[in-house]
Curated annotation (Swiss-Prot):
Keywords: Aminotransferase, Arginine metabolism, Pyridoxal phosphate, Transferase. GO terms for molecular function: identical protein binding; pyridoxal phosphate binding; succinylornithine transaminase activity. It catalyses: N(2)-succinyl-L-ornithine + 2-oxoglutarate = N-succinyl-L-glutamate 5-semialdehyde + L-glutamate. The modification N6-(pyridoxal phosphate)lysine is found at residue 252. NCBIfam families: arg_catab_astC (TIGR03246), argD (TIGR00707), PRK01278.1 (NF002325), PRK05093.1 (NF003468), PRK12381.1 (NF009047). GO terms for biological process: alpha-amino acid biosynthetic process; arginine catabolic process to glutamate; arginine catabolic process to succinate; ornithine catabolic process. This is Succinylornithine transaminase. It comes from the Bacteria. Pathway: Amino-acid degradation; L-arginine degradation via AST pathway; L-glutamate and succinate from L-arginine: step 3/5. PROSITE patterns: AA_TRANSFER_CLASS_3 (PS00600). The gene is astC. Pfam families: Aminotran_3. Its EC number is 2.6.1.81.
Length: 408
């Protein structure tokens, strides 16, 4: 018999680095979840842009079960068929010629930054070690990646931090240009800053970064952990901009809920990563890569990407209607199904309160800082789920505006 558990047990047993919602989800199907009490929620959080095909997608369950009945793990002393097939699919679908598999976005970004330093050291010299990143970015929680992320709140308690990392203002080419020089080995940027407020890069900004990197022989790294795998209406967001990175990192939606990450690059850059320079125990395991292969099969189609664009329009139309009623948002922005509603000054700092009220109303949403409500639903969310979920979100907005909201 299974141990009976409650939300209170989290506070008793877990390291307190999170403050989870007061309910515990126990079952999901598509874009719906149910908690221990049987209450239904429409899921517009998507596991923070992970559940690209919703919960318990039949094809993903089938792929996982089929591989689970074969074998689970061998370690990096052996390769496996699902990993090789997934690598080929990613290469065929992108600019990449080489793939490194890992387990998360942080690991993918760690690998990307290490590759950039190794390439610069081997080809130029150890003095070429500078990394330029951007304020309010998020690249992971390892010491290297949290230092590259431009949010001191996440890194200030862990000094001394890795050196030679500087931060420019996002979408400000002059700010970046002032920092990028011949000692820069890499520039790492999110095409859409997710945690930083759902802010899409301008085309001129990314094109300018490409030109600066070419001029100074620095590698351009696109962190597509949140924007990748169809989230923006293209398989990867770089395809919107006509700007090709040297390295791309991907995770989150790649496994549709099963943990996996990957770093994509070219043969030339990958060639410096010789045996022993980097590694992973679980990365590229057959369970993860079997599921991710099926995710790509489903998402990397014109029909799916057209559907994302159509659903984007449906969200924007309904969110604008909600805003016309309540006047809570100064801006609604984003690409595809990564959307952010920026709160008016009157409601500044209340994004978390809105998310809490939304959950009470039966819809799960995210925040991106204190002033932005974020949506990252499944790419196959239905019209009915969009309508029902946003009706519930409107109820949460109404409660907040009329003073009926309460913390908790």
């Amino acid at each position: 018999m299974s141990l009976s558990v409650t939300r209170e047990n989290f506070d008793e047993w877990m390291v307190p680095v999170y403050v989870p919602a007061p309910f515990i989800p126990v079952r999901g199907e598509g874009s719906r979840l149910w908690d221990q009490q049987g209450k239904e929620y429409i899921d517009f959080a998507g596991g923070i842009a992970v559940n690209a095909l919703g919960h318990a997608h039949p094809a993903l369950r089938e792929a996982l079960n089929e591989q689970a009945n074969r074998f689970w793990h061998t370690g990096n002393g052996y390769t496996n068929e699902p990993a090789l097939r997934l690598a080929k699919k990613l290469i065929d679908a992108t600019f990449a010629e080489r793939v490194f598999f890992c387990n998360s976005g942080a690991e993918a970004n760690e690998a990307a930054l290490k590759l950039a330093r190794k390439y610069a050291h081997d080809r130029v010299g150890n003095h070429k070690s500078g990394i330029v990143a951007f304020k309010n970015a998020f690249h992971g929680r390892t010491l290297f990646t949290v230092s590259a992320g431009g949010q001191p709140t996440y890194s200030q308690d862990f000094a001394p931090l890795p050196p030679d990392i500087r931060h420019a203002a996002y979408n400000d080419l002059n700010s970046a240009s002032a920092l990028i020089d011949d000692n820069t080995c890499a520039v790492i940027v999110e095409p859409v800053q997710g945690e930083g407020g759902v802010i899409p890069a301008t085309k001129a900004f990314l094109q300018g970064l490409r030109e600066l990197c070419d001029r100074h022989q620095a590698l351009l790294i696109f962190d597509e952990v949140q924007t990748g795998v169809g989230r923006t209406g293209e398989l990867y967001a770089y395809m919107h901009y006509g700007v090709t990175p040297d390295i791309l990192t991907t995770a989150k939606a790649l496994g549709g809920g099963f943990p996996i990450g990957a770093m994509l690059t070219t043969q030339d850059y990958a060639s410096v990563m010789t045996p022993g320079t980097h590694g992973t125990t679980y990365g590229g395991n057959p369970l993860a890569t079997a599921v991710a292969g099926k995710v790509l099969d489903i998402i990397n189609t014109p029909e799916m990407q057209n559907g994302v664009r159509q659903r984007h329009d449906a969200f924007i139309e309904r969110l604008n209607t909600i805003n016309a009623r309540f006047g809570m948002f100064s801006e609604i922005r984003g690409l595809g199904l990564l959307l952010g509603c920026v709160l008016q000054t009157e409601f500044a700092g209340k994004a978390k309160l809105i998310a809490q009220e939304a959950a009470k109303a039966g819809v799960m949403v995210l925040i991106a800082g204190g002033d932005v409500v974020r949506f990252a639903p499944a790419l196959n969310v239905s019209d009915e789920e969009i309508a029902t979920g946003l009706d519930r979100f409107a109820l949460a907005c109404e409660r907040l505006q009329t003073g009926g909201a309460s913390c908790g």
